[in-house]
Amino acid sequence: MGDFSDFTAYAKETGGRLSDQPLLFETTKRLDVTQHELFNYVSDFDRSSEWIIGARKSWTDNSEAEVPGEVGAVRVIKSGGSTPVLERVKAYDAPRMLAYCANDEAFLGLCSDHLGVMTCEPHPDGGTVICWLAYGRLASNPLKAWAGKKLFQVALGGGMKNLERKFSSR
């Protein structure tokens, strides 16, 4: 698969700038798609349910956005639970970076102070390297902390697999 450290530096710098919480999970893939096409897809909140694990429906609330879909916009994700997950855009740099934070209630006490960072970097040999990071504070209870870490492994890992299916990996 290769070393992606040159392609993940911007994601990690962004995460370090926007969060004082530890990195909990990271997944990185090279996909056979242009940077613009991939970024437009993952930042289109109305289509998030097509690739985010467990999402049944998704939409955008732009009522507090500086620009629709950008900083202040909220991705609303409806899954099996009665209360939707709300993810507010914290930073946006098209076609390269999207950073968002989810409401603490979404994690059922497993994690708080969440920050997600996604970057799309063009690869010199073609395609795009996507990096998806999750930062947060895990619960102090060891079992809940373990479950919180698993939650990110499943959510980010499964979401990345869905992106691989849509845009074949290299």
Where on the chain are the PLM-derived regions?
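Hydrophobic pocket/interface hotspot
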Residues: 37-42, 48, 75, 89, ...
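A conserved amphipathic terminal alpha-helix motif
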Residues: 3-8, 135-170
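Glycine-rich portal/gate segments that line the openings of hydrophobic small-molecule binding cavities
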Residues: 30, 50, 59-109, 161-170
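Hydrophobic/aromatic beta-strand elements that line small-molecule binding cavities or substrate pockets
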Residues: 27-29, 85-91, 114-122
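Hydrophobic ligand-binding cavity/cleft-lining segments
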Residues: 1-63
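A generic structural micro-feature
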Residues: 19-21, 79-81, 108-112, 124-126
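Short, solvent-exposed aromatic-acidic interface loops
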Residues: 101-107, 133-140
